[in-house]
From Swiss-Prot:
It comes from the Bacteria. Belongs to the SfsA family. GO terms for molecular function: DNA binding. This is Sugar fermentation stimulation protein homolog.
Length: 238
């Protein structure tokens, strides 16, 4: 995924009302931009830290830009725009980068499924007619002195619901995959954030016991673009 034009750099003044952020450009100009992240953004932003944002040329937009990347307190880079994860995964799927899911012949987005009326991020179908349901989560939570990232960064009942739906598919013999897109530099593994959401961690382990596949992929990212580039281990019982 290439950012065009290249992202602009600024200094974060504050994030507020969840979806708003005030930033200051190098020339002293201050802007209010959109924050496309509903999570707590724990450990992936700091007031006064560096951020990178994209500008919009749409005159109908109320805000001139979107916050894309943040410098974390640990000096890493995090893609805080959670909407990028699905686009990155689709790009990687079509390129064959995610080897565990290579060789599909059909890809559909946002397909309805399950008893709890969920929508799967990606429905894949292979040459022999076998389907695979793939749920994507964006990971940006890192910690000092460890290369292990964690998910989620806030309690997520929705995330636990998705795991239950995937587990129900697996019980029927249908391939179900939870894929973590790690949009954070300097990471070597992923784990459930049990200290933040124990119910989610338990749901993840239960889903794996039912046959759900859990994958994680890391990214390279900077102001020019982001690309999924390597598989990462998932530590279910760190």
């Amino acid at each position: 995924m290439v950012f065009f034009p290249e992202l602009e750099q600024a200094r974060l003044l504050r994030r507020y009302k969840r979806f708003l952020a005030d930033i200051e450009l190098a020339n002293g100009e201050q802007l209010t931009i959109h924050c496309p992240n509903t999570g707590s953004m724990l450990n992936c932003m700091r007031e006064g830290g560096q951020v990178w944002f994209s500008r919009s040329n749409d005159p109908k937009r109320k805000l001139p830009g979107t916050w894309e990347i943040s410098e974390t307190p640990q000096g890493r880079l995090a893609c805080v725009n959670t909407g990028r994860a699905n686009a990155l995964v689709e790009e990687a799927l079509r390129a064959g980068t995610i080897l565990e899911l290579a060789g599909f012949e059909l890809l559909k987005r946002e397909v309805a499924y399950g008893e709890e009326r969920s929508r799967i991020d990606f429905y894949l179908e292979f040459a022999d007619g076998r389907p695979a349901y793939v749920e994507v989560k964006s990971v940006t939570l890192g910690f000092p002195d460890t290369p292990v990232a964690a998910f989620p960064d806030a309690v997520t009942q929705r995330g636990a619901k998705h795991l239950r739906e995937l587990a129900a598919l697996a019980r029927q013999g249908i391939r179900a995959v939870q894929l973590y897109c790690v949009n954070l530099t300097g990471i070597e593994a992923v784990r459930p954030a049990e200290e933040i959401d124990a119910a989610y961690a338990q749901a993840l382990r239960a889903a794996v016991a039912e046959g759900v596949e859990v994958l994680a992929y890391g990214t390279r990212l900077d102001a020019r673009g982001i690309v999924i580039d390597r598989p990462l281990p998932v530590l279910l019982n760190p």
